[in-house]
């Protein structure tokens, strides 16, 4: 009699994905982030579900309902802050996961990579709509500013914005639909994650050397299951430390003031994980130009497989490309810092320089350096 794990139609899928999956023997801790993102997604859906049980998507009661969750619901404060800080963890891991993909050339798996970029867009949309739900000052003004960007689309822009708002300004209709979308999107994301994994398991995982690892594979369980559990342990320690000691560290104090359409906050800015894109948006004085730069700053990820010009897949043995990679990381950190600063003299120029450098590094410096490395290696 065959093992049920290998014969049962449903369990067989799980077995081929997480148990008997042949994995390269040399994948490092950088390969932990995929599973961590899965855990984060599960955690967000679970905490979000419990929050939705007590939240009311109405402009008059939304803010009070969040206060009620924190004060009156059993461990409501814990659920709320796990959800808010869980989103931050989610994005930290997302950026690490993408960075790993760029460094080790994982973008060569075109299908997996492109679904991944679409996943990034979906997660960003979900996070943006979630930030609107507490209906604080930054929620309201963030929603107003970001949705207004669509008015830059020629001809249909203004109509499109009013259609999204469900009226002539951000109001009750907007909040209700944002809640509906924020609830449904994580399930769509889960389906996309399954497709992401389906494509990945067609090719098998990449590894730090970037070379074919068919000759040296080990079963996913127990080797990488135990490694992933260790990663989850570190993640939970970090998340719970944030939640228990400094739950508002990554939030904005303005969001503790109920939304007031008659009073604009002095500095409208998104959550920290969007600041780099916000800095790129602000660095262009033209509205449509800024919106295009914002979209392209993420969409540019789809060009990586096309721009790859090295004979080697990974950057492990390419010191010049490594320098550029870390330059890009530093550049993104500078953009993140600038995104949180007011639009004043030194910051405007720094933001514009960092934005130009971001696109220049990816589109010109990285491919040309890879070609130079080929020449140096006489390839």
Swiss-Prot record:
Tagged with keyword Transcription regulation: no
Keyword terms of this UniProt record: Electron transport, Heme, Iron, Membrane, Metal-binding, Mitochondrion, Mitochondrion inner membrane, Respiratory chain, Transmembrane, Transmembrane helix, Transport, Ubiquinone
GO molecular function: metal ion binding; ubiquinol-cytochrome-c reductase activity
Record-listed a ubiquinone binding positions: 201
Localization (cell): Mitochondrion inner membrane
Record keyword Transport present: yes
GO biological process terms on file: mitochondrial electron transport, ubiquinol to cytochrome c
Gene Ontology, cellular component aspect: mitochondrial inner membrane; respiratory chain complex III
Transmembrane segments: 33-53, 77-98, 113-133, 178-198, 226-246, 288-308, 320-340, 347-367
CDD domains named in the record: cytochrome_b_C (cd00290), Cytochrome_b_N (cd00284)
Main location: mitochondrion
Residue positions binding heme b b562: 83, 182
InterPro entries: Cyt_b/b6_C, Cyt_b/b6_C_sf, Cyt_b/b6_N, Cytb/b6-like_sf, Cytochrome_b, Cytochrome_b_C_euk/bac, Cytochrome_b_N_euk/bac, Di-haem_cyt_TM
Record-linked SUPFAM superfamilies: a domain/subunit of cytochrome bc1 complex (Ubiquinol-cytochrome c reductase), Transmembrane di-heme cytochromes
Pfam families linked to this entry: Cytochrom_B_C (PF00032), Cytochrome_B (PF00033)
Membrane-related topology note: Multi-pass membrane protein
Cofactor(s) needed by this chain: heme b
Cofactor binding mode and count: Binds 2 heme b groups non-covalently.
Residues binding heme b b566, per UniProt: 97, 196
Function: Component of the ubiquinol-cytochrome c reductase complex (complex III or cytochrome b-c1 complex) that is part of the mitochondrial respiratory chain. The b-c1 complex mediates electron transfer from ubiquinol to cytochrome c. Contributes to the generation of a proton gradient across the mitochondrial membrane that is then used for ATP synthesis.
Similarity section: Belongs to the cytochrome b family.
Further remark: Heme 1 (or BL or b562) is low-potential and absorbs at about 562 nm, and heme 2 (or BH or b566) is high-potential and absorbs at about 566 nm.
Subunit composition and interactions: The cytochrome bc1 complex contains 11 subunits: 3 respiratory subunits (MT-CYB, CYC1 and UQCRFS1), 2 core proteins (UQCRC1 and UQCRC2) and 6 low-molecular weight proteins (UQCRH/QCR6, UQCRB/QCR7, UQCRQ/QCR8, UQCR10/QCR9, UQCR11/QCR10 and a cleavage product of UQCRFS1). This cytochrome bc1 complex then forms a dimer.
Name this polypeptide is given: Cytochrome b
UniProt source species: Ctenomys sociabilis (Social tuco-tuco)
Gene name of the record: MT-CYB
